[in-house]
Regions:
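Residue-level signal for inorganic ion chemistry
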Residues: 35, 58, 85, 112, ...
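Active-site core segments that coordinate phosphate-bearing ligands/cofactors
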Residues: 17-18, 116, 123-135, 145-165, ...
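Structured loop/turn residues at beta-strand edges in well-structured enzyme cores
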Residues: 80, 210, 396
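N-terminal glycine/serine-rich phosphate-binding loop of ATP-dependent small-molecule kinases
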Residues: 1-106, 133, 159, 230-231, ...
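Short beta-strand-loop/turn "lid" adjacent to the catalytic site in phosphate-handling enzymes
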Residues: 75-110, 136-142, 167, 171-191, ...
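Glycine- and other small-residue-rich loops at beta-strand/loop junctions that grip anionic moieties
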Residues: 108, 140, 218, 243, ...
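Short glycine/proline- and acidic residue-enriched helix-loop micro-motifs
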Residues: 54-56, 128-138, 211-212
């Protein structure tokens, strides 16, 4: 007999809502317990501000877009009881909010690097170095902790202005008051996933630990949807709300790549690669960090600045689908390409001065399809280097890769990724972080992997083409050589089979 669900429904009849706060928009998906998507919605985010190292968005627009996306997802099921709702957000994005979870300033985005231009006093930097040693990884300028220090130095944190991570902020808007955070979102605010907030270290860098939120396990119930939020979103009032996660972890959940050796590669605006290990992976360079697995163990990975946003930057007015048709029959390009917009890379290597480049035969051409082709190859080589980096740190990086994110819809690009990686790449039927948040909303405590296996279906499997292996291995060597020439990675020996 099915277990009772919310409001007297049966578990098998309940629907689960996932909300994904992305860089360019908000997405929502309504999912059944068997993984069937019953409704989807999305809304763009248009009021962002980029100015050098500054990158801000309007948290009010996050809430407006959340309402629009959720109303669209629920359109065919008005008033249907929901099992629970869960929200994911971009890792490292921070906002100040009041006692009713309303914003009192702009959202400082995950890649806002103003801390580079406004270094902390020497005593604070020394305390940050001590904190980094305690955490076992550096505290880079884009971490939420650095943003928090910047806000504190400006006197903007106080009783009526407490920090919240992006996903927690929208979760709080749903509940009607601030909510606890989870270990994945708190990591870049300096939270120690093994021992909690390092209060003594935070005191020494000048932050009051009392201003920081409580931390609960990912997926823990944190409240119910308030009447005002119900009117705004269409979610029935009283629907359970659970602590969310980062967009990268949500995408990993959507892939069901939660067993050691399996990896989830989310290629969208940026590239995020995550896997599962029984022991925590430590990277002294800070390119790789590990989240707590809600089931136990660890979820190591990293997030690059490289990603598909380079297409719109380098090829304005051109649609990737049109360029794909023209690019699919082109030969492996000569030279090397790094697909980066802006300055600075954080994974699979840390190089604050890194910029995109395109070198060798065919570089600098004006044909959009050839330019798209070279950028696509660059993305695949970044992904291969990322897996190599994880393997050198001791992670089991030999297994299947599951591709999620918007780029997974491009079959040519996904096949290219399988060919460059020289391993099978799976594409789930539903590849977005919103789906992963819906899985998290449904998962009982300690059963996230089992819930994901039950809900996630494979739509395609791409096998690597052995006829292309030698040419692509040579291309990867050129790629590594170009990075080493710039001092971004150490010189490498001949790459073997991944």
């Amino acid at each position: 007999v099915p277990a009772p669900g919310p409001a007297g429904t049966c578990e098998s009849a309940a629907l689960w809502l996932g909300i994904d706060l992305g860089t360019q928009g908000v997405r929502a998906q309504l999912v059944g317990g068997d993984g069937t998507v019953h409704g989807s919605g999305g809304a763009p985010l248009l009021r962002g501000r980029r100015d050098g190292p500054r990158h801000e968005q309007d948290p009010g627009e996050w809430w407006e877009a959340t309402g629009a996306a959720v109303r669209s997802a629920l359109a065919d099921h008005p008033g249907h009881p929901l099992g629970a709702v869960c929200v994911d957000g971009t890792s490292g994005t921070l906002v100040l909010q009041d006692s009713r979870a309303r914003p009192v300033g702009p959202g400082l985005m995950y890649d806002d690097a103003r801390a580079t231009r406004a270094p902390a006093p020497a005593r604070t930097e020394a305390a940050l170095d001590d904190l980094a040693m305690h955490l076992g990884q550096p505290v880079p300028p884009t971490w939420a902790l650095r943003k928090l220090l910047l806000l504190a130095s400006e006197g903007r944190i106080g009783p009526g202005a407490r920090p919240a991570h992006q996903g927690d902020h929208i979760t709080g808007r749903l509940v009607g008051c601030p909510v606890p955070t989870d270990p994945t979102q708190a990591l870049k605010t300096g939270h120690d996933p093994e021992h909690g907030w390092p209060r003594a270290h935070l005191d020494r860098i000048g932050l009051d630990p009392a201003h920081l939120p409580e931390v609960v396990s990912t997926g823990t119930p944190v409240g119910t949807v308030a009447p005002g939020a119900a009117r705004h979103t269409g979610i029935p009032a009283g629907t359970p709300v659970r602590a969310g996660t980062t967009d990268g972890v949500a995408a990993q959940i959507a892939s069901a790549a939660l067993a050691p050796g399996r990896w989830a590669a989310t290629l969208g605006t940026t590239l995020v690669l995550k896997g599962s290990t029984p022991r925590r992976i430590h990277d002294p360079a800070g390119a790789v960090y590990s989240h707590r697995n809600p089931d136990g163990g660890w979820l190591p990975g990293g997030a690059a600045n490289a990603g598909t946003r380079v297409w719109s930057h380098a090829l304005p007015g051109h649609h990737p689908a049109d360029l794909t048709e023209r690019a699919r029959d082109l030969p492996v390009p000569g030279g090397a390409t790094y697909p980066l917009t802006g300055t600075g890379e954080r994974f699979p290597f840390v190089a604050p001065d890194a910029t995109g480049f395109d070198t060798g035969p065919g570089s600098g051409g004006t044909d959009p399809a050839q330019r798209f082709h070279r950028l696509a190859h660059g993305l695949a080589h970044v992904e291969r280097l990322a897996l190599d980096r994880l393997r050198t740190l001791g992670a089991p990086a030999h297994g299947l890769v599951t591709a999620t994110g918007g780029a997974a819809d491009n079959t040519w690009l996904t096949q290219l990724r399988a060919d460059v990686l020289r391993r099978p790449v799976l594409v789930p039927a539903h590849t977005g972080s919103a789906f992963g948040s819906a899985v998290l909303a449904r998962a009982p405590r300690g059963a996230l992997a089992a819930t994901a296996e039950a809900m996630v279906r494979t739509a395609r499997r791409h096998e690597p083409d052995p006829a292309r292996a030698d040419a692509l291995d040579e291309a990867h060597e050129r790629f590594l050589h170009a990075l080493a020439e710039r001092g971004w990675i150490a010189p490498t020996r001949q790459a073997g089979r991944p």
